[in-house]
């Protein structure tokens, strides 16, 4: 995904252009490939950061784009980039059509500080992604999964079709195994008969429903039982169940979600946003 409006220098940023080597290429969906790159000198990064990528043609012409890291920072020296094929996109087309393992890629980073998450922030997290906007959020999700004690998390993911659900098996496994990880996936276009999830764009009602479900699970655990009666007897959680939100996707998508979260009472500084485009 092309990244980050308003992101500046962040933890571990290297401002010089360097060379990374492509270790593997994996087709995650019909329009998205995952590229695993080995960084120079075991470079470290934080969950939520991105790298600038630069291509240089034989005649000296250069094209540059920014791509978010989807891998966990627990594995320094290696990053995974989510690159969606954009019609007419110079950099994404080159990666999809020409890049193979062993190729050397020019990059700069890691970049970004406002959109990062580190384990010292322990309040419940809301993550919302549209399409390939899942990339930096996947890094946060994976980092959280490495912890012995981790904050409650709700991840809401909007995609066009079932084929566009990136990292589906990994996400569904986490949701099944981790009682503190809630997952909502919604399809906005082609919906197969077998689909049992949401089928529209993420809106206020969907967010409220997801909030209620996540809050209800918390109340049941606090009561020490799984009965509705115990849930009613448990202390009511605050009206806004999440301490911080991370939203990544197209501009309209991000602004719509952020505006509604402000209406629910979430503080402006606790709503972290990242927009992308071609």
Where is each model-derived feature located?
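A short, basic/flexible loop-to-alpha-helix module at the beginning of a structural domain
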Residues: 110-121
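Conserved S-adenosyl-L-methionine
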Residues: 122-123, 143-153
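Reductase modules of NAD(P)H-dependent flavoproteins
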Residues: 13-16, 156-278
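Histidine-anchored nucleotide/phosphate-binding helix
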Residues: 134-146
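Structural motif
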Residues: 124-126, 154, 244
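Ferredoxin-reductase
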Residues: 2-103, 159-161, 186-190
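Short, conserved phosphate/pyrophosphate- and ester-handling motifs at nucleotide-, phospho-/glycolipid
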Residues: 48, 133, 250
